[in-house]
């Protein structure tokens, strides 16, 4: 017989209490966690001890208002409640204008806005809160997504649509400078710091970052890339996406719109696609498209970028080698459809979604429906909208009216059902960002985060690490001890997309001077004069050493035949004077490489040569004076001379050119991607 087990009342009570405790712990693990709810207009609904916003004010907890439900279900419910007009409005993103906001929100149904003014974090947050309140009053209470171009980098001058704000958040070197640090952990830290600053200020979407591979040295927008290496660009792209967004998009994320797909580096002779004369992308080297242009975008896609920005450039069949699989060709003789990226179904749907696995939405660049509608100039506005939607576009940049899209539906160029999947992607982003629950922020906290000394210290570290020592064969550096120093800064005029000397283009923003730690000789002298061991002299004859900082800008020839990167008065450099200074005294020549300039006339005469990439002067002087040993590496290959530039393949990075492309100095070092010295060698 099996033994009989008896249970006492005490043992039964103990077993029950344990079971209840286990059940309670399991329930706690599975119970929904209440997110922070801030409803300044919409009333709150209570379900037990949980709170929800009654965004449509009908007294019922609708599925789209229920944060416990999966995002896809919330999206589907909200879509079913939206009118055609509301869907079309959601597919527009325009520059923010407080005076027009009520009209934009309630008549045009726009919810995506680009911030282009250079305000403090406190001001941005306060204004965003006011705007979000107005959005919460709307029929369905759909919140606003505020977007911005990058605003955490040193810029001498601010440029519309590229770098419209600087100096109000932590101030880092330019993106080329971040690449030059050769420190992927520091780049990730930058992204995480910027994310916290942006989100606190009420900005939830970044028009960036720009991961185009810089293959054509004359291209104006190299300044805002991470350089010429597809591999290094891909590593950086991954960290930028993960740093800004996190492993998944959430209430603390800043959504990225990685640009400019499929890569704007291979422009014709450096001419920029913001202008009709620069519209062509050329791929003369067979296989270059997949080998060099796409890896950074693939890395961003794999990291989960929320959106991708297409560009204006129009792929040239006449000047391109074989790039695409034959089954993607338009015909036996036509490889590419020669239209701007926003209209190119092969690139956006077959390549980006089909082959690369992109799950987010496509955001056009500004003006693709109007001035930059390359290849579709003969189409009406509704036809352009229809072609772009069919190609795979969800969000039209700087379009302040959905009327053309509505007309496309009314003219039966599109069905409302064509808009639905694109609107679903946009709504998914807004839900994931947590904006339906809490679109508001604390303006004082925002300012505190933006002014963090710890963030400023990490940014200063990046400035110092970004500086590249190219030559020091005379051991002039570090420049320690007492010195009589002659100082000169030579700077080009602010360039625009049209460039200096060119017609058209979007130029410097009036009254905005960026973050000029040094905007000229006087500013640099003032900074140096704080060191009591340095005596600034006004004449080269009085000096025992000279410091010359060249800060050129690209010159766009009026004939629009090519962009000029040779150092000359046209790019802001008096070459004869530089050579005169170098001949008179040992000279530290510092060159700000926002493009890979042609330096063969000024480099040989210097005693030491350094490269900067939009850096604070304080960081440069720390390296010059020996307070920090240089560790930076070139993110670009510097061309040997004008002949090398003229011969370069615009779709191939400088380090991979098929001829002796790189500049070689007098000690036989080549200034190629990844090169950089330090004081110990």
PLM features per residue range, with description:
Residues 1-2, 295:
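Accessible peptide chain termini
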Residues 2-14:
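Bacterial N-terminal signal peptides that target proteins for export
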Residues 11-23:
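Bacterial N-terminal signal peptides
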Residues 24-681:
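Glycoside hydrolase catalytic-domain context in secreted enzymes
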């Amino acid at each position: 017989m099996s033994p009989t087990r008896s249970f006492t009342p005490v043992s039964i009570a103990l077993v029950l209490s344990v079971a209840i405790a286990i059940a309670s712990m399991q329930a706690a693990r599975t119970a929904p966690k209440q997110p922070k709810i801030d409803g300044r207009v919409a009333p709150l609904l209570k379900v037990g001890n949980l709170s929800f916003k009654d965004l449509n004010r009908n007294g019922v907890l609708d599925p789209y208002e229920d944060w416990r439900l999966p995002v896809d279900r919330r999206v589907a419910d909200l879509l079913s409640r939206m009118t055609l007009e509301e869907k079309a409005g959601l597919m527009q993103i325009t520059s923010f204008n407080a005076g027009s906001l009520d009209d934009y929100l309630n008549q045009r149904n726009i919810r995506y806005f680009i911030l282009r003014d250079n305000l403090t974090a406190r001001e941005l947050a306060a204004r965003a809160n006011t705007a979000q309140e107005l959005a919460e009053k709307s029929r369905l209470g759909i919140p606003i997504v505020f977007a911005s171009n990058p605003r955490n980098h040193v810029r001498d001058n601010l440029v519309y649509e590229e770098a419209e704000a600087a100096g109000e958040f932590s101030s880092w070197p330019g993106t080329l400078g971040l690449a030059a640090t050769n420190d992927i952990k520091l780049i990730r830290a930058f992204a995480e710091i910027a994310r916290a600053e942006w989100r606190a200020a009420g900005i939830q979407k970044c028009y960036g970052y720009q991961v185009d591979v810089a293959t054509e040295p004359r291209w104006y927008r190299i300044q805002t890339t991470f350089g010429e290496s597809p591999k290094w660009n891909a590593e950086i792209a991954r960290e930028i996406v993960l740093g800004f967004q996190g492993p998944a998009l959430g209430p603390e994320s800043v959504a990225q719109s990685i640009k400019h797909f499929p890569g704007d580096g291979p422009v014709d002779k450096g001419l920029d696609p913001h202008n009709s004369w620069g519209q062509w992308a050329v791929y003369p080297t067979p296989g270059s498209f997949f080998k060099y242009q796409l890896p950074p975008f693939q890395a961003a896609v794999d990291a989960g970028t929320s959106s991708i920005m297409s560009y204006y450039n129009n792929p040239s069949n006449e000047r391109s080698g074989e790039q695409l699989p034959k089954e993607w060709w338009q015909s036996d003789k036509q490889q590419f459809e020669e239209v701007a990226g926003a209209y190119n179904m092969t690139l956006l749907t077959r390549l980006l979604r089909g082959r690369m696995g992109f799950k987010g939405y496509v955001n056009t660049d500004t003006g693709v429906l109007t001035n930059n509608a390359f290849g579709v100039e003969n189409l009406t506005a509704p036809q352009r909208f229809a072609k772009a939607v069919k190609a795979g576009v969800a969000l039209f940049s700087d379009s302040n009216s959905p009327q053309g899209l509505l007309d496309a539906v009314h003219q039966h160029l599109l069905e409302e059902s064509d808009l639905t999947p694109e609107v679903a992607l946009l709504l998914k982003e807004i839900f994931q960002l947590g904006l339906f629950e809490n679109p508001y922020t604390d303006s004082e906290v925002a300012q505190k985060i933006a002014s963090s000394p710890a963030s400023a210290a990490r940014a200063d570290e990046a400035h110092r690490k970004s500086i590249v020592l190219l030559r020091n064969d005379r051991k002039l550096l570090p420049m320690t001890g007492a010195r009589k120093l002659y100082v000169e800064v030579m700077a080009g005029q602010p360039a625009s997309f049209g460039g200096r000397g060119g017609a058209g283009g979007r130029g410097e923003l009036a009254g905005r001077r960026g973050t000029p730690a040094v905007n000229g000789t006087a500013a640099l002298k003032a900074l140096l004069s704080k060191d009591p061991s340095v005596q600034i002299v006004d004449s080269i004859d009085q000096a025992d050493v000279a410091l010359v900082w060249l800060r050129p800008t690209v010159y766009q020839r009026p004939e629009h035949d090519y962009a000029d990167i040779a150092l000359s008065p046209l790019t802001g450099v008096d070459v004869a004077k530089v050579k005169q200074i170098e001949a008179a005294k040992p000279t530290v020549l510092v060159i700000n490489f926002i493009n890979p300039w042609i330096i063969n006339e000024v480099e040989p005469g210097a005693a030491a040569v350094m490269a900067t990439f939009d850096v604070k002067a304080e960081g440069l002087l720390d390296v010059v004076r020996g307070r920090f040993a240089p560790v930076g590496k070139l993110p670009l290959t510097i061309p040997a001379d004008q002949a090398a530039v003229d011969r370069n393949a615009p779709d191939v990075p400088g380090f991979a050119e098929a001829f002796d492309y790189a500049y070689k100095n007098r000690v036989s070092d080549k200034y190629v991607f990844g090169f950089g010295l330090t004081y110990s060698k």
